[in-house]
Structures are given as C-alpha cells and as structure tokens.
Amino acid sequence: MAQCVQSVQELIPDSFVPCVAALCSDEAERLTRLNHLSFAELLKPFSRLTSEVHMRDPNNQLHVIKNLKIAVSNIVTQPPQPGAIRKLLNDVVSGSQPAEGLVANVITAGDYDLNISATTPWFESYRETFLQSMPALDHEFLNHYLACMLVASSSEAEPVEQFSKLSQEQHRIQHNSDYSYPKWFIPNTLKYYVLLHDVSAGDEQRAESIYEEMKQKYGTQGCYLLKINSRTSNRASDEQIPDPWSQYLQKNSIQNQESYEDGPCTITSNKNSDNNLLSLDGLDNEVKDGLPNNFRAHPLQLEQSSDPSNSIDGPDHLRSASSLHETKKGNTGIIHGACLTLTDHDRIRQFIQEFTFRGLLPHIEKTIRQLNDQLISRKGLSRSLFSATKKWFSGSKVPEKSINDLKNTSGLLYPPEAPELQIRKMADLCFLVQHYDLAYSCYHTAKKDFLNDQAMLYAAGALEMAAVSAFLQPGAPRPYPAHYMDTAIQTYRDICKNMVLAERCVLLSAELLKSQSKYSEAAALLIRLTSEDSDLRSALLLEQAAHCFINMKSPMVRKYAFHMILAGHRFSKAGQKKHALRCYCQAMQVYKGKGWSLAEDHINFTIGRQSYTLRQLDNAVSAFRHILINESKQSAAQQGAFLREYLYVYKNVSQLSPDGPLPQLPLPYINSSATRVFFGHDRRPADGEKQAATHVSLDQEYDSESSQQWRELEEQVVSVVNKGVIPSNFHPTQYCLNSYSDNSRFPLAVVEEPITVEVAFRNPLKVLLLLTDLSLLWKFHPKDFSGKDNEEVKQLVTSEPEMIGAEVISEFLINGEESKVARLKLFPHHIGELHILGVVYNLGTIQGSMTVDGIGALPGCHTGKYSLSMSVRGKQDLEIQGPRLNNTKEEKTSVKYGPDRRLDPIITEEMPLLEVFFIHFPTGLLCGEIRKAYVEFVNVSKCPLTGLKVVSKRPEFFTFGGNTAVLTPLSPSASENCSAYKTVVTDATSVCTALISSASSVDFGIGTGSQPEVIPVPLPDTVLLPGASVQLPMWLRGPDEEGVHEINFLFYYESVKKQPKIRHRILRHTAIICTSRSLNVRATVCRSNSLENEEGRGGNMLVFVDVENTNTSEAGVKEFHIVQVSSSSKHWKLQKSVNLSENKDTKLASREKGKFCFKAIRCEKEEAATQSSEKYTFADIIFGNEQIISSASPCADFFYRSLSSELKKPQAHLPVHTEKQSTEDAVRLIQKCSEVDLNIVILWKAYVVEDSKQLILEGQHHVILRTIGKEAFSYPQKQEPPEMELLKFFRPENITVSSRPSVEQLSSLIKTSLHYPESFNHPFHQKSLCLVPVTLLLSNCSKADVDVIVDLRHKTTSPEALEIHGSFTWLGQTQYKLQLKSQEIHSLQLKACFVHTGVYNLGTPRVFAKLSDQVTVFETSQQNSMPALIIISNV
C-alpha cells in the first residue's frame, strides 16, 4: 500500500473515538450560526486533547490515555442512506486529487525507472470518511453515544427551564420505542449542561448568576459556562483570525446536496437495520453531524424518492464531480468563526478538556467498573473479570468450528441485558479509551460465547476487534492474529453478506499487515474483496494492492502495472475519470517501449478517451497519436476504430482554434530522408519511331557508379570548353537530388520550370488512408532588381499563385501497410529563394457509403470518388537531417551533421532548354554493324542555345559524320540499296588491286591534342533559336563485344546570354544496345624475304588475315560476304591481294573461316611527307564491283574512333633504369625496327532473313597491327590474371638493370636473304667436290648505322660433334665485318662445298649486329625466318 500520513498506531485510535451527542436550543444554535457553524462544528477543531489524561481500570491500576479525541455530533434520528453514503464517498474521492507540482518518488526496479506518487490522499480521505460514516450497529457499541451535551444560551428568558426541556427531549429520544436511532451506550447516559454566552452582546453578570444556579443544580462537574463571540461580525475583517474549521466542513457541505435517486428508508426495527446495511457499498463522512433539532433527517438522508432501488452503481455517481464543484463554489468566500477571537478558541479548547476530565472520563471509568461488577456477579466469581482473564483463557479451550460448518445465524439477536453483550460493551469501552489489554481479554471472551451460540455477526465483530486490540497492545505480548481477521472477513462477506463490515475489516487488516512489511499478504487481502457490486471500492483496493506490489523488498513491477490497469478500469466504471486517467498513466511507464504493443494500445486508447472526457484534448490527441504511430499488431477493424477516434478528437481540438496554425498529423509516415527533388519537365513518352532522350527522371534508381560516370563526362566536356582547365567554381549539374547526392549547396532551379518533390509515404496501419487536397507547403523570398526582399508564407497553396504555382492532388489513397510515393509540383514564376517546408493535406479514412454516428456531412468531409468518414486538415514537416560530419577531430569526437539543402532551391533567370529525339534508333545490332539513324534537336525554351556538344565514354559507337561527308556524293547504287556507306561503282579490272585515297584525322575530330570523346554537334550557324529544331544523321556501330551495352550520351549546351548562376546545361541519354556475334578477325604482318623488285629501300610485308563467322544464326543471319578490305596508315598501304583467284567466293556461312593474304608496301615519299598534317593513306581492296570509300564518313569516322580508343589503352613501356640517355635512344632505335603502323578495315555485308524478308546489313571490323610477327585481333582479348607470387617480407635491393631489347627486336635489326639455285646437278664421279655460288643479301631495317659480323663457321654444341653425313662447308673467308648505313642493302658472294648428293640447309651463316656507336652488349645472332634448302643431284 502507499505511504500514509498517519501510522497505524495513530490511525486506529482516531477512527474509533468516544461519541458524544449534542442537543441545542434554538437560541444557542443561533449564537453558533453567527459564525456559520453549528455547535458540533464549532467544537470539531478542538476535539483532540493536547495533554495526557489518566483513569483507573477495575483493578484500580492507573491507565494513561494519549491524544484522546472525542466526536461531538448533533442528534440525528434517521440512519444514513446507502445511496447518499455512496454519493458522499464518490465526492470525497473526486475532490481529492494529486497536488500539482508534487514530486513523485523515483523507484528503480531492474530496467524500470518509475515515477510513482508516494501517497494516495484520495484513498486516505475515502478510508477516513468511510470509517467515520459507519452507522451505530446493534452487535457492537463503538459508535454508540456515551454522553449528551445539552446546550442553552444565557440570553434566553429561562435557561434552566430550557435545560430541563432539553433533558426531557434527550430522554424521550433514548428511551421511547419510536426512536430506534441513534444508539446509546448505556441507559444512564451522561448529561452535560453547557451555557453559551455571547460576550459581545450578552449580559455577563446574568450569565454568571445563571451558571452559579446551574452548579448548584447539576454539580460543578456536570455543567460549564462557555463564552464565545468576543467580537461582532462587522469587525471580522479588521484582523485575520485562523480558520481551523474549513478542513472539517467540506464533508458536511457535501451532505447538503440534493437530487439523489435513492428514496428515504427509515429503520423501524433492529432486524431491518441489519438487513439494510447489507446493501451499503461504502460509508462516508461523519454521520453524527446534521442540522439542529432535525431529529428525523440524517445528514445523509435523501430528500427525493424517485427510484427506491439501492443499486450500488447507479447513474448517480456521474454527478459527483459536478456537485462537488458546485458545493465548493457555494462555500467559497464564507468566513467561519468570524465572531471568534483567539481567546474564544482557547475557551473552546478549555471547555473540551473540562468536559473530558470532569465529565466524560469519570463516567467511562464508572461505567467500566459497573460492567465489570455486573459480569462478576452474574458469573458468580469472587474476583474481577480483569484478574481472572488469565485463568479463563489458559485452559480447556472450546474447539472453534469452521466457518463452513456454521449455520447462517447472522440474524440472531441478544437482548440488551445479555451477559455476552455486556462483555462486548465493556470491551468496546476499554478499546475507546485505549485500554487494549483489557479490551483484548473481553473480546476474546465474547468471541467464544458468540461462536458457541453460532451468532456469527457478533463473533465476526469480536474477532475483528480482538485482532486489532492484540496488535495495539503495548509491548506486543502476543503476535498479531491475522487468522482472526481472515475469519472475520470471510464471515462478514460469505455468511452475513455484509460488505460494509467486510470492507472495514480489510482496510484495518491491510494497514496492520503493511506496518509489518507483509505487502504480499496485504495485496492478496485487498484483491480478495474486489467484486462487481462496487466499482469505487474495487478501484481503490486494487490501486492499494498495486502499491503493495511495488513496495515489496523485490518490487513486482509488472504486477503493479497490471493492477493499476484494473484499478483504472474500475475507476472509469465508477465515474472517476481523473483517477482512471492517473492509473493508466502510471501503468504506462511499465508497458511503454517493452514490446507489449497490444497493452500499450489499450492503455493509450483509454488515456485518450479519458483525457477527451476531461477535456484534456491535447493529451487525448497525444495518446491516440501514439496508437497510430507505433507498429500496431491490432486487427484492421480495431485500427480503424482507433483512427476514427483520433480523427474525432482531433477535429474537436482543431475547432477550438480554427484560425491557429495547422497541427502536425501523425499519419501517414513520411520517410524524410527518402525525399527526392527533381528540377525540370517530365520526360516525353516515345512517339512511334521517335524516342526522347532518357535524361533524368524520378523513375530511375540511383546508381553510384553511373552517377560518377556522368560526373566525369560533364567534367570532361567542361574541361574542353575551358581549354583544358576545369573552373574552380564548377559543380556537377544535379537534376535529381536524393539522399546519395551532394546536398550541401543550394540547388539551382530555373524560373518557369517545374520542381517536382517526391514524398515517400508509408501507411503503418492495416486500414486505408485517404489524403485529399494534398500539396506542398512552402516559403518564398522573392528577389528583384531593386534589391528589396519580401517574405511570404503560403500555407494555402491556392492563395497567390503568381509567385509560386502549386499542384494539388485531390485524392491520394494509401492501402493498408503500403509504401507509396506522391509527386507534388511547384511552378516558380519569379526568381528568388524557395524553401519547401512540408506537405499539407486532409487526413481521413474510407467509410464506404455509410455515415459515421449519424453525423452526416461534417466540415472537412470530402465528397469525391471516395466517401470519407471524417477528415482533419493538418500538415507534416519535411525535415531532412544532413550527413554525419567526420572531417575534423572535433567532428569525429562529437555527433554533428551537415546541412541538407535539397528543399531550398534558388530560382534563377530563364535558361535555354534542349530536347533530343532519336529516330529509327536500333536496340539490337550485330558486332561491328553500321546503322544509320537520325537525331532531332529542339529548343523548347524562350532563349537561344549554342555550343552544343555531345560527350560519351564510347565515341567509337556513333558519329555525326566528318567534314568530308558533304564532299562525297551518294552514288545511285548506294541510294538504291540504302547503304550507310559512301560508295562508287568500279570496273572489273580493279579487283584485287588497291584503290588509294587519303584523309586527315582532323576532319574527323581526332586531331592532335583533342579529346575524341567530346564531339561538337554540327548545328547550322552553331545556334538553335527558341522553338527551332534540326535533324542530323547519326551513324551507329555495334560494339565488338557481344551482350547488352549501356552507352551514355551527355549533351552540353550554353545560353547565348551568359548567366551568373548557371553557365551551362546538360541533357543525358542512355542507350541500351544488345549486340550479337558476327565476325572474328585475326591478322599478322611479317617481312617478305624477297628483295626483288623493291623500289628504294622501303621494303614490303605480307599481311595475313583470318576471318571467322562466329554467328550462330540466332539473329537470322544466313551468311556474311567480305566486300572490301582496306588499310589505313601513315607509312604503309595494301598493294594487292596475293591468294585470291577469280572464281574465289568471299562469303562465309556459319562457323566458316576464310584466309586472306595481302602484300603491303611503304607509302611513297610524297604520301608520307604529310605525316605532320595527320594524313592517313587509305587503300581499298574490293571483292566486287562497288568501292566503299573508306576515307569518307562513316567508315573513316569509326576507324578513327577505334584508333583513338586503342591509343588510349595503356601500352607496355620499357623500365627506365639506364645510366645514359644514349642507351635509351639505342634501345628505341632497335624497337622501331619491329614496329609497324598498319590498320586493317574489314567491310562486310550480312544477309538476314526477318519476317520472310531478306535484309542486308553492313558493318566493319578493325585490326590494328603494331608489331611484326605479333597477331592482332578485331575483338578484345581476355586478360589472364597474373600468377600469385610469394609474399616477401624484406625490402628488395635496388639493383639497376640495364635495358636490353628483346631477342625478337634484335632479330629484326638486320634482314637476311640467301639467293641460290633450288637444285644443282653435279657429276660426283668426275669431280668429288661440288661448288655452288650463294649470294647473301643483308638489309639494314633501322635508321641508324649498324656494324655487322657474318660468321660462316658451323656452330657445334660439343667438342665431340663431328662432321656428319649431309653436312657441307663454306669455302673462302669464314668471317666478314661490315658496316651498313641506314636502310642499306649489301650483298656477299659465298661458295658452298658439297661432297655428297642430298638436301641441304644453307641457312647456317650467323649474323651479329650492333649499333655503330654502342658497345657489344647488343650483339645477337640474326635468325632466318625459314630454312634455305638446296637439292644436290648427281649426273
């Protein structure tokens, strides 16, 4: 239980006090009424004695009584009515609420930190009122009157005669059978005569004389002169006198209420009295007080009788709070004791002491002795009951019967003179004067007698008081008999059916157990008495049980919370809304955030309803909000009910302040960080073959890799525009801002271009949500040229659209548990600073065609496609938290976030706006296929644009054509076949012979120092006017790798008028191309060994080309035709085809392979002289009657783009560790000997069957030959991963390695050729030695002087190697030393000697070479490319 202000040792004596009646004359009552008090009320604050009093027990032992309190009340002849008592208790509890600002106790139990009120004053008020309102009962005497004060005034004509009348009236009330109420302790009641004297108006001398007369008649100890009203009421305001009565009078004022629904019920017999008590649910305030001389009307008597039922929980409790409020209001301003001074207070206090010392206590002491003597004489004992107690209770105990074995004898009545009642009467009298030892003895004796007689009501009363007396005995001679209390409670409840007495028993026992820290037993006891017959009592007991659980040594937090919920429920049923709300709030501390979602929902729902009933609308909204924003596990129907309650409450709140700011709505959830902002118009849909550029849209998902590619492309084109330098203030253009983009700067938007904000909603409920009139909330700072700034806040989006137009979504439906985005647009019409604050909308739910609660059309209800049950207008803010800062040490050690300004765009001046459309743009190509499409550029703004460029990472994929495109007319055949190439018709004589042309790479945008990725778009006059459009051809070439390719185009353009904020704009397009296999081309180049017919020193080479058809016919390709092979080089050109016969067909079916061999020669000196102008010589070898001009668009375009992309690939460079620069130069000279700059272009046609039609596709492949003898491919080769190496844990020594050319490079330094007859006939029988002349030609392939050593000696691998059969020897000089100039050819005449016939290899001479100005480290043997075989025959 909660802590109490009083201890149990103080509580029980104050709850059971001697009762004294007061009977006043009318004049005496008038004197006290001058102070707005009755006589009994006048005495109430002074009814406790301030000093100890003494009395002697029957054994003449002195007994000390501490803090004795007496209860004086007017005589009332009607018992209190159950309905009135119930009403009074309700009002007492309602009127006692937690004090505002009271600091609660913080209890820590496990993971819980609970703020719990340490005290429960409402329960203490209820308990006090309940105990003091107990009526006088026949089976006990605790509330029976012990004495009666007869009060008259000194101003009366005959005061003594008035006393006689009052005495007779008291005697008539006590002894007349017409009055069964009130109850009197003994027939000979003490009468105490009090003479009231008004000091301010009365005659003091007369009062003294009357008092002297009284003393002679009634004795000095039986009367008293009480002087009051020392000042007049008109002087009451002159000085402030304390008002000790106000705390006692609130309950009395409650008693004066009317309009109860229970009728009067006058008790006419003792039996009826008992039966009537059975229906009492709880009793309140002091029933002894009432109106003067109204003997038939109890203060709790009901005045109206409309419903005779005594229902415990009738509707009357609903008026408790209001009636209490009215009562308080009526009493406000009344000053009690206005005519009394502090001296009068002391006189009243002295009067109570005199009455107690001289009248009441001697009377009680005398009565105890008389009762003791009566009991002794009746039982025939020789000594007093007190002295015989030990003997009586020590032996031969009567076995107590079980409660279940006893008959229901609660109606058994004893006559007033019965000895059993005399024992009980003596026990009660001893208890009232705190003589607990004697009281316990008497109760114990009476209990035995009652049980023997099976008078269960009497027995239960004796057991109850025996247990209390045993506990209160000084020194605690015996333990507290809790089983007495348990038996008494069970008897009251189950046998006697008297819940009032059972409740009193529980209240006392719980306090006794709590004082012994037996909280578990106390909680069980409190819970046991909860029942359906009284919600108020059950609520209070459950709450105290909850406090027991939390105050245990190991607090039981969840039990505390559960019982607080039960208590709150019963408080709610009892009409105690404030207490119900408090209980639920206390319990919420335990359930909140622990995953008990259903319990949380129930508590919040109840808190919301109770708060709404109490008009705490903000609290109600908050509670309902919590139900909706938490992840609920409720059913859809329940969630719908919650939502409707919330909307109803919310609507009431909003109606209180219709002109106030829009409130925040809890639903639906908004994921602010997922908010995306898009600047610009929506993308146009495809129109037939006309497809708009993909650009940027909110439908695209963010890809960091793609975003980085676009950034690099933009940087690349900006660098080209700014002559290779990226401006310091450059920032990549961002059309779509999201959580991944850089939002640290204010984004730039263009006036008259829409701003789309995508808001991510999520409905956590299982019911539909309908948002109506959904739009953005914004704030705008217009900026004009005068420099004035104006701020306008638009909360209604339709108010002034001339600044910012806003789109309104009339209906936006979100299904249960659905995530859905809404795209809302703003249309800026003025330059300035825009701040997007949030969204505003009406929140409702669909009710179908039904109206809710019969309300019909409410304000805010929407009549549209859906039928709303109810809707409320509100907003939600879009607050986006920026990224976590982690740069400086301070930022790393603290939690700081940067700004996120995606919702704060700056509206800039008008800019051009480009739209790009692609016409006949393919989605599928063969690898290397050439296709012609068209691109349309449209300026849809009011500003001209210029500087249009396109940049792509894949420039080899497309071309707009070079400068030569207009110089080459279309041939008739090309037009007829719709060929993408420029062609001319040739005659048959040119077959297999190269046709020469030339072109400059500058004409195709591949000039020196330029970036091939950035391509200017050839606009007419370089400007596109507003509203103008232009169509340009675009050739496409399928990538060499099969698969799906994503190719990015970035179009860059500027405004003719330079803007300070935005310098350029971009447009993005991503093309998706699916390529399938076509041809694989391999090529190698090697030196020709033939030195004949060579002009000059250029030399010639052979080019071997292998073409394989790798298409698997999935694209419907029947066959490929090789229509032309072209070369492009600054130094070399194809001369003729070597192996093609006239009837050789060049078509390749699936998986077929074709081989070609071509002779390549050096370009003429005139042709090669233009190398500095980036001129390339193109040689075309055609296999048909139509020449494709390879030096024109689009063939040359794609060749140059493939060349530039190849040049971008990292080349293998020699490590530079040599000591001298001359050594490096030598190495470079040697490397150049094996290098070749020859590019092969294979042009083909493919015949495709599609939809029963035959189509002709065209394409080209490129092979770039760089090194003699090294195979090159038209398709990229897979790189093998390097082998794993062991990890080294030491630093390698820095050893300088001399740079040496490779063996292959050295072998290409000198080209050798042997000239000899293939067969030679010699008559060996005539001459044994055969001499054959051989010419050795040496050709210097480098451009430096070379020293050559020719060694003719046979190389032997071991000393044992001898001349074997088939060998020959060289005659003459065995070693030659020569020096060859740059590209010089030298011949040596040699003689070979044979002694046998056979086939011999003449390729045995070894040639060593080194550069003339270098050391011998470069010497190496020159290896012949093929054996030189000679046949020696005998004739």
From Swiss-Prot:
The modification Phosphoserine is found at S273, S279, S309. The keyword Phosphoprotein applies. Coiled coil: none annotated. It comes from the Eukaryota. This is Trafficking protein particle complex subunit 8. The keyword Ubl conjugation does not apply. Belongs to the TRS85 family. The gene is TRAPPC8. GO terms for biological process: collagen biosynthetic process; COPII vesicle coating; endoplasmic reticulum to Golgi vesicle-mediated transport; Golgi organization; vesicle tethering. Its main location: Golgi. It comes from Homo sapiens (Human). Plays a role in endoplasmic reticulum to Golgi apparatus trafficking at a very early stage. Maintains together with TBC1D14 the cycling pool of ATG9 required for initiation of autophagy. Involved in collagen secretion. It holds the Pfam family Ig_TPPC8_4th. Residues 301-321 are annotated as: Disordered. Component of the multisubunit TRAPP (transport protein particle) complex, which includes TRAPPC2, TRAPPC2L, TRAPPC3, TRAPPC3L, TRAPPC4, TRAPPC5, TRAPPC8, TRAPPC9, TRAPPC10, TRAPPC11 and TRAPPC12. Interacts with TBC1D14. Interacts (via C-terminus) with TMEM131 (via C-terminus); the interaction is direct and is involved in collagen secretion. Residues 302-312 have a biased composition (Polar residues). Changing R537Q: In a breast cancer sample; somatic mutation. It is found in: Golgi apparatus, cis-Golgi network. Keywords: ER-Golgi transport, Golgi apparatus, Phosphoprotein, Transport. GO terms for cellular component: cytoplasm; cytosol; TRAPP complex; TRAPPIII protein complex.
